[in-house]
Amino acid sequence: MKGRAHIWVALLLACLPPRFRNLDKDVSSPVCRTDDVYTGDAFYPFKKKKYVLYDVHIGEGFNLQKEVLYRVALAVYYLNQEERTHVHYLVLPPWCYVTHWGRERTNARIKWSIFFNLKALQNVIPVMEYAEYEGQFGPHTDYILSYRHIIGEWPKRGDKKSFQVLKLDKCQVKGYKLKKNLRKNCDHKYSVEYSGKCTNVKGKKMECLEFFFITSHFVSSTLLDIFQYDADSVLIKHGSNILVAFMNELVDANLEDVLPYSEDLINEGDQFVEKNFKSSKNYISCHLRYTDFRKISTYDVSPVGISLLKLLYIMFLRKSTLIFVSTDEKKEVKKVIDSQFPQFKHFFFFYENEKLHTGQVAIVDQWICARSGTFVGNIFSRFSMHIKWERSLIGKGGPDHNLDLCGYSISTNHELRKKYSDVQDAHLDEEALQKLRPLYMRLSQKDRDFLRTICYDFAHYYPQNVSIYRRGERREEGRLM
């Protein structure tokens, strides 16, 4: 009996985190996996695990899918705070098909760790990639759940239920199937397409919940109810239906700053800056979005030529000789540079790497933009927004170093002007203008007005604290004009 007791004590000590073991060295344990430890809970190894899977609407962009992670992660955080007898895992959906990856449809099921450093997120909530989950449980879950916002007036009824439970097809879940003519002992009767048609996930039960405000807190409360019964895993279909969290919610949960880029991709961007800019901080970066934005009249995208001329003006204004361009139309932009600005061609730089995945190239682009002295983006673009988010986290979030190119009709379109926090119709700087004089003289009045107008995004959309996970330095910021 004593021998068994000693074995139990040995196992207990092996599983406890280092601060409980009082050991000088963190000896790897044969019992507890070091990559499977929830650092926020000392007694994690002894708790039963529950799993929250999710996905988004098929084809959603890379940066929107990144945003949805924060919403679901916040729900899982609330779960672990509310219910401490179990530990709840966030299962990250694989990347299979993303709209902006074009024809690069793949069944490779790319992991999040290819793009991001997950250690920061794992400090807040337990996280695992879907590949690991599938390895343990197969493509199965106990519950398939989706949410739908109530549109219109809440129906009058005698009872006071907080939400309505509907059939899953009422949530417009595509690829949903109910298997018929099954054997009696078949548990997983329901099947849905999962994560950009990566695979099909089968579930035992399914529900669609309808409510006014699908917040992360509401989601956590419904998950808590489900997990209290005989359920160990839930798949949330269309996690993008969850409302965006308030910044203070993310800050309070330590989730404001949990998706740093992969170290490999950061190093790739750093090497590009070192090679081309000699590590100069005074380069201009920009994001020019054209492909689909041209079709949306309210975005009022300016022509490539006048956009590039405005970037040159800002470059000369900032006493720089370097412009890094991130764009979804590199060939078109390069063509315009060659034809309209051959004398300034040596000022423009692009990042290209055929060995990397499209998503990886996009992140390297974002990091190079994040490091720049001044960034010029598009307030309607999530790609630009995530660059500004990253810049805020490395101490470059000041408004005068994060500009918007402005809509093309900004000087006359009053509704468009309301979409910016500030619009300045400034006088042109003569010294900077002198270097562009021949080109400026050929401009129409509309183009001249566009050139001198400076637009600003809303700073309160972005983090106000410098990250402990990201590398960067604060810098003194002055007015642009």
Swiss-Prot record:
Record's keyword terms, sorted: Carbohydrate metabolism, Endoplasmic reticulum, Fucose metabolism, Signal, Transferase
InterPro entries for the chain: GDP-Fuc_O-FucTrfase (IPR019378), OFUT2-like (IPR045130)
Pathway field: Protein modification; protein glycosylation
Top-rank EC class of the record's enzyme: transferase
Catalytic activity: L-seryl-[protein] + GDP-beta-L-fucose = 3-O-(alpha-L-fucosyl)-L-seryl-[protein] + GDP + H(+); L-threonyl-[protein] + GDP-beta-L-fucose = 3-O-(alpha-L-fucosyl)-L-threonyl-[protein] + GDP + H(+)
Disulfide cysteine pairs (residue numbers): none
Record protein name field: GDP-fucose protein O-fucosyltransferase 2
Similarity comment: family membership: Belongs to the glycosyltransferase 68 family.
UniProt-listed Enzyme Commission number(s): 2.4.1.221
Active site residues according to the UniProt entry: 60
Record's subcellular location: Endoplasmic reticulum
PANTHER family named among the record's database cross-references: GDP-FUCOSE PROTEIN O-FUCOSYLTRANSFERASE 2
Species of provenance: Plasmodium vivax (strain Salvador I)
N-terminal signal peptide: 1-22
Binding, GDP-beta-L-fucose: 59-63, 287-289, 365, 382-383
Positions bearing the site annotation: Essential for catalytic activity: 390
GO biological process, one term: fucose metabolic process
Assigned GO CC terms: endoplasmic reticulum
A UniProt-annotated Pfam family: O-FucT
Function: Catalyzes the reaction that attaches fucose through an O-glycosidic linkage to a conserved serine or threonine residue in the consensus sequence C1-X-X-S/T-C2 of thrombospondin type I repeats (TSRs) where C1 and C2 are the first and second cysteines of the repeat, respectively. O-fucosylates sporozoite proteins CSP and TRAP. O-fucosylation regulates stability and intracellular trafficking of TRAP but not of CSP.
